[in-house]
């Protein structure tokens, strides 16, 4: 009787499992199984049911297990757990007898029911419920790493910094480099980017200084005594830069300066323009340009005149401009024209007149 009942129970249990397997077989791949596949499944299911019937019959006959007539594998597992000293509740909760766990262990929104003999202790997870004012600093009420009365009541350490981060700034590696600043770690999340506050110097874009008109703002090269600065840098129309009189003290200015534009390009005394500026007066606004005199030196008001001494006296006669190789001597300051050149003695650069039109119009004018 017991054996027959066991066989019937096994048949019922096997049928249930077999039906599930058949349904799963139909759903696999989204197609209907072929005839040969269905026959193989039936043969496999009949063999499984026969083995399950023998197992249930042996447990009822020799093990003394209280198995219902129509039982499944879960009932057999429950019976085996009861014999081994485990308790299986109707919802499936299993634990050793005498070590019933607490009702529920709430840990930051999740429930964990560890086994009594397990050494696994769930660690609290950090909360990332950010406050409205910042996207990286968690709120104090939801984060377990911030000091809060609720956190201390739940047994969670309210220390805002982890212990191993505390000793990071005091480690030997940081002592080797005393010039490095100490490590400052915020109590919240340190992985999210943080927008610097308005008081931070990095939050404001660097701005150029616009106080160019102030008298105390001077270039770095104005204090130098280099004579090349004055000649190579055109002065501003709004201000007059006076060169250092020290480097002009030893220069002797000549009174003779031909009016030919060609002479100024190869003039033996390019500083003759300074005397013209002195003779005009202190309030003169005459500025010399390379197109007019060949030099780019501003007028220097207030400079005392010097005796007229030719600078060409220190140069050899054979290298002087206008000298003759046949032994002839020419007067100083005269220029001899070469082939194809005309020297305009009677017209200066200021007397030139520009006319437009054809040759007839110019002839009539």
Curated annotation (Swiss-Prot):
Biological process according to GO: brassinosteroid mediated signaling pathway; DNA-templated transcription
Regions of biased composition (Polar residues) lie at 215-233, 356-365
Q: Which InterPro entries match?
A: BES1_N, BZR
Identify one Pfam family in the record: BES1_N
- Which positions are tagged coiled coil? none
Bias-annotated ranges (Gly residues): 1-30
Q: Which PANTHER family match?
A: BES1/BZR1 HOMOLOG PROTEIN 3-RELATED (PTHR31506), PROTEIN BZR1 HOMOLOG 2 (PTHR31506:SF30)
Name of this protein: Protein BZR1 homolog 2
User: Can you name the source organism?
Assistant: Oryza sativa subsp. japonica (Rice)
Q: Which gene encodes it?
A: BZR2
